[in-house]
């Protein structure tokens, strides 16, 4: 699917905002469903809906206003109750971003989760699961100190037909809470969905922003992939207080921003951004 990036899609540094990029990606999957069947609506009227449990994205080159991009998607296997999906974003024949998503199908009335063998997606284009550098199964350590940084009220314009906040919205909401974001660009985004946020509910946002990748366990500076000296995130991804996101793997990042949100007394999402300081 082709997309033209406009002035409303980019931030003050002329880089595409995370939610806008994810919307391009997810709309491509929606288009595939509509063309190949079953469509979103066919599933919905049969009391079924896809819910996302995990989304991981790497951005290799920033996307700007007036860029024309092409988004591609495919089903990438299944296991148990989880369908895997791959995504690529192309610009001028180059892959500028790649992503992976984990999805399940639920009954929209009673919450029953279907096994993959009960849902026929054989008409969809399929391929291999993308190999990402970042750790898709990251964990926020229990001892990482998190500080409250905001409350977001879920409004109707953010919700999908299930009356929950659409998964694409979270990226911008959390991105807005990153310290010093005016001088940074995103190299990766990784999010786990734990509980849905209903329309008219409040989301409590908690933040921990570790300065990572400065040193490895041995005290040596981390090196870039080409062996050069760099402040890249290494396998010990560690902040100033010794708190760790184990083996996060974003070697393009200078630091990470870590978030956890809650709604209705439950953990809502957990997310990590890889960030690079913009050289001016």
Predicted regions and their residues:
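Residue-level marker for the onset of beta-strands and adjacent loop->beta junctions
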Residues: 53, 83-85, 187, 203
């Amino acid at each position: 699917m082709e997309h033209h990036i406009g002035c409303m899609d980019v931030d003050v540094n002329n880089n595409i905002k995370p939610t806008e990029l994810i919307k391009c990606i997810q709309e491509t999957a929606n288009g595939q469903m509509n063309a190949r069947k079953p469509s979103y609506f066919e599933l919905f009227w049969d009391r079924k809906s896809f819910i996302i449990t995990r989304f991981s994205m790497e951005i290799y080159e920033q996307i700007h206003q007036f860029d024309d991009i092409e988004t591609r998607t495919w089903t990438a296997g299944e296991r148990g109750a989880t369908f895997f999906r791959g995504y690529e974003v192309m610009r001028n024949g180059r892959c500028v971003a790649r992503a992976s998503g984990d999805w399940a199908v639920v009954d929209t009335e009673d919450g029953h989760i279907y096994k993959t063998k009960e849902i026929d997606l054989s008409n969809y284009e399929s391929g291999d699961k993308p190999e990402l550098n970042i750790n898709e199964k990251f964990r926020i350590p229990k001892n990482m100190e998190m500080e409250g940084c905001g409350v977001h009220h879920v409004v109707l314009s953010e919700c999908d037909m299930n009356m929950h906040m659409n998964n694409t919205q979270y990226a911008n909401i959390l991105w807005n809470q990153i310290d010093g974001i005016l001088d940074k660009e995103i190299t990766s985004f990784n999010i786990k969905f734990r509980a849905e946020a209903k329309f008219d509910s409040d989301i409590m946002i908690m933040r921990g922003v570790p300065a990572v990748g400065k040193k490895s366990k041995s005290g040596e500076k981390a090196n870039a992939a080409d062996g050069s000296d760099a402040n890249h995130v290494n396998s010990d991804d560690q902040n100033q207080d010794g708190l760790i996101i184990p083996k996060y793997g974003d070697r393009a990042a200078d630091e990470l921003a870590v978030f956890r949100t809650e709604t209705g007394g439950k953990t809502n999402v957990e997310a990590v951004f890889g960030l690079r300081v913009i050289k001016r």
